[in-house]
Amino acid sequence: MKKKIHPMSLDILATCSCGNSLKIKSTIKKDILLDVCNKCHPFYTGTQKKLNIGGRVSKFKKRFDNIVYKK
């Protein structure tokens, strides 16, 4: 294998908008800012909101619920 062709892997600090900081390895040479992390993302915190608004199927059923089919 060729030597010295791989980029240097450095420890950098990734800071989230919520204030949480993570020390990670990366090939970039500067610290990064994250929008979300595992401390503030709704999936990981369990604070997801599921909106149950009428979709296409419920609109279809509501529209054609009163129709009587003749044989």
UniProtKB/Swiss-Prot annotation:
Zn(2+) binds at residues 16, 18, 37, 40. Binds 1 zinc ion per subunit. GO terms for cellular component: ribonucleoprotein complex; ribosome. One of its GO terms (biological process) is translation. InterPro entries: Ribosomal_bL28/bL31-like_sf, Ribosomal_bL31, Ribosomal_bL31_A, Ribosomal_bL31_sf. Pfam families: Ribosomal_L31 (PF01197). Disulfide bonds: none annotated. Gene3D superfamilies: Ribosomal protein L31. One of its GO terms (molecular function) is metal ion binding. Keywords: Metal-binding, Ribonucleoprotein, Ribosomal protein, RNA-binding, rRNA-binding, Zinc. Its cofactor is Zn(2+). The keyword Membrane does not apply. Part of the 50S ribosomal subunit. Binds the 23S rRNA. HAMAP family: Ribosomal_bL31_1 (MF_00501). Belongs to the bacterial ribosomal protein bL31 family. Type A subfamily. This is Large ribosomal subunit protein bL31.
